[in-house]
């Protein structure tokens, strides 16, 4: 299938983390395959594979295919290197093969993935975006906190956003996710919204992928 408009690779990987934590894949190699791969960019695949520690697997793997070669060309890799990558992976049996057999399979329909958040403590604690408000109230109802900050004219209470970060090697390597964050920020500015003084804003850069 294909993800709905507005749903990102981050939503997809949080769904996968939730599913695979329930399944139990500790110590296993997880390969992602199926018809839906043709609708996932290499950046989206990298987002999923890079979250292997979160879903507990030894590694998350996408077989090399034409999308991989397309990405190498897009990022101006040397043509000799690209040819070597394709030849090597075909010889080594790492090229995508629809005839492979697997010990176990978990099915996921991409069109069913919804916008979501995870937390507040564990990445597998996924909650649909539309239910975050109720979920937060339920989580914090028995934890009343209010603290006056010395030398400042505000009080802190449970639920205040004190850190707003677009971070991790997963998020900052995916251009679609960064563009989405930029569009949300622009819309907030257009509506006259801005972060309060005690919220720390950060956007660390990442290495070349």
PLM features per residue range, with description:
Residues 20-27, 55-60, 78-80, 185-197:
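Secondary-structure transition/capping motifs at alpha-helix termini
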Residues 1-37, 50-51:
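Catalytic alpha/beta core of large soluble enzyme barrels
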Residues 5-7, 53-57, 171-189:
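Alpha-helical support elements that line or immediately flank enzyme active sites
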Residues 199-205:
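Conserved small/polar residues in nucleotide/adenosyl-binding loops
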